[in-house]
Each structure stands twice: as C-alpha cells, then as structure tokens.
Amino acid sequence: MNVAFQGIKTQPWGPLTLVTAGLRADAEGMRDTVVDTRIIKQALKLACRAPSLHNSQPWRWVVDGGTVMLYLDPDRVLHATDHTGAEALLGCGAVLDHFRVAMAAAGWVAHIERYPNPNNRMHLASVDFTPMDYVTDGHRALADAILRRRTDRLPFGPARDWESVSVALERAVTSDAVRLDEVPDELRSELAQASDIAETLRVYDSAYQSELDWWTGLFESSEGIPHSSLVSASESDRVEIGRHFPVTPNTERRPQVGRDQARILVLSTYDTDRTTVLECGEMLSAVLLEATVAGLATCTLTNITELWPGRDVVASLIGQTTTPQVIIRVGQAPGLEQLPPPTPRRPIDEVVEVRSQQQ
C-alpha cells in the first residue's frame, strides 16, 4: 500500500524524534502497511519509560518487519516480591500501552493481539499497524506525558479540579475486565494500617529484603531505583500509604505540603487470568498518562496488593469482590518545583531485537 506523507513535521521528545503529523493513506491493504523500523524503534524507546516493579523493566521486544512482538523476560521477574508474577505482567501491560500511545503520536493505530501463541506464555502480544487519518493534539499530549511522568514518593497536595479529572481517569479505563475505584477518605486510615501490616510481614523476609536492597543499590545502573527517587525518613513519615524503601539523607522536600493529601485509586480485575492482568497494566498506563496530562503527580503502589490479606482488605475498602492489582496515589506537586531527573532505562538495543527491518 502506498503511504504518502504530506507536511511531515517532527516533535522532539528529549532524545527521541517521532514523526507526528500529516499522513494520508489508501484504505486498501490496511494490515499490509509496513512501518519504517526507525519509527518503531523510536516509539519503543519512548514506551520503555513505562513504570515497573523496582524499575526492573521485565520486557523484551522483537521487531520483524511491520510486526512488533512483546515478550516477558523471565530473568527480570522479582520472585521474592512478586510471588505470582502479576507485577511483571502489569509492567509489561504498561509498556504495551505506552507503545500504543507513542505509535499514535507518530500517526499509526496499533492493533494488539494478546497471547497470540498458546504454546509460549512469554509471548504476551503481537502488534501491527494501520495509518491513522489524523494525529490530534490529544495524541501528542499523551506521548509528551510519557516523558513527564514520574513515580513521585513525596507527599502530595490535594488534586485540583478533582471532580472533572476523576471522570477523565474513569474514561481512560476502557477494558471491561478492569475497574477503577477510589478509596473513600473516611477509610484512608484503614488502608494505611493495611500498608503498615504488609511492611511488618516483610521485615523478616530475607529474600524480599535482599531483592529490595539490590534494586535500590548505590551503584550507577540502567535499572533499579536511584537514591534520588527515594525519600528521607521524615518525608516517608508524611506519606502513610507506601512501601518502606531504604531511607536517604535527602534535605526535607515539600515542607509546605505537610502530610500527604493524595487521592487513593485502586485498579482491580474481575479475574486473575494472565490476559486480564496484562490489560490491567495497560489501564494503569492510561490512568497515569491521563493524570499527567491533567498536571497531577502520581505514585503506583503494590506493597499491599502483593499479599492476599492485603488484597482482601483493599477489596473491602472499595466495596468490590474484584482482585485489587495496584494502588495509585494522585495529587498535586508544587507548581514551581523542578521536575526530578528521570529514572534510568536500559539501552534500547538491550531491549529490542530487530529480525528484519523496513524503510
């Protein structure tokens, strides 16, 4: 199929440049359209900014002509923390949706087939593409949000215009297998208690503690959580819901905020099927990016939902019989605060294998 790019312009995203506008294409052929491999790699580099447990980045991509395949990397599943492997799937779902967003900003609709190979459970998705009629400002805003999003463990101020923002976040959850709920303020203390209990249960879990120490080490790396992304003891004390990481000697930040005033959201699933959990990761991406577009800060939490007792408590707090998969703090960071440096990511050539390419 002939694809004519007219009035091509590029939108710089940090180290990336994606084609973002002005293509026309014939309606015939559709899935036979082949995307330039360079565009795919640029989009994958942007997509790999997705969050994952301890920034473990448990994904691997294969580009074969115009088809892109996502695989779970079993060597990057943190088994002591993530007993079921669900958090690795959530991270892979998030990177899959980030990729969809990046390709949309480049002018392509991503068609996703989840678990295409019943004989290979590591093969999570295959993606092919058709040209988009028109790239909107909304498509570009979501792609820009990928680079602006951070996992912010500091206390938040109250979210502005929450009523309208919460509606947008609910609309972002498009999977029938996943739901988004908010923990009522009056039940917040019970969630904080569940968070404390979850941490207490892990105090003497040597495998868990070893894993945590490894992924928050002092060494320079392209993975894990750098100390610049962690908080001091006093900062941690002002956020009652969260994982206990090794504390840092950072100067007290956001003293004007006081105690955390974030809204607490829960993404849960109607079953625990691997496909559903993968979709939940995609919905996590959608909620995080929509919140970022709205100018809000976010922090994903799984310390409570990693253990069945914690999941049961969270389900009762939202009044559902679903399985809570991830908690999201959403709130306001001070407007004049400088955006912290991004957490590191592995080089794209370590993550992406190109078997055949198109130009």
What does each model-identified segment do?
Residues 2-359:
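Acidic, surface-exposed loops and disordered segments
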